[in-house]
Amino acid sequence: YGMITAAHEHGAEGMKRAVAAGITSIEHGTMMTEEVMDLMIEKGTYYVPTITAGKAVEEKAKIKGYYPAVVVPKALAIGPQIYNTFGKAYKRGVKICFGTDAGVFTHGENGKEFYYMTQAGMPAMEAIQSATMTPAIMLGIEDEIGSIEAG
């Protein structure tokens, strides 16, 4: 049908199935494996890592009583996990689009995503392109929006 589709995925099996079925992008991708990364490269699937959301959950887990005790270990682990997954996916060659899962963290802090992306190894210009031209290409509207040009 030519639709742009996204899957909110954390587990590798769900990602593998979504990518195999032709999903346009994977959001979060927390437990992404190298097998999934390779399939994403093969299928041209984009990855929207939302590192800032994972880091925000991790920080909130350090506040006593913020989450139920049973949730705290998982919440503490998600920030480092999603950060490491992003670094591996970027280095492997998965196409990256900027995204933050806004609402998980304080409004106005989405720019932190650039910081996390560059700290994990993405050059600053590629991080900027992940928020401008790359999503425009993913959406098929790169002739209309996405470029930053003089003039």
Segments and roles (model prediction):
Residues 11-13, 51-53, 102-104:
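Active-site-proximal loop/turn and secondary-structure-junction residues that shape catalytic pockets
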Residues 45-57:
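Non-cysteine beta-strand/loop elements that form the S-adenosyl-L-methionine
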Residues 34-36, 57, 106:
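Glycine/Thr-rich phosphate-binding loops of Rossmann-like dinucleotide-binding domains
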Residues 33, 54, 134:
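Residue-level detector of flexible, active-site-proximal loop/helix-junction positions
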Residues 4, 67-70, 78-151:
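His/Asp/Glu-enriched, well-ordered alpha-helical/loop segment
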Residues 58-62, 110:
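Short acidic, glycine/serine/threonine-rich loops at helix termini
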Residues 1-47, 61-64, 76-96, 143:
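Histidine/acidic residue-rich metal-binding segments in metalloenzymes
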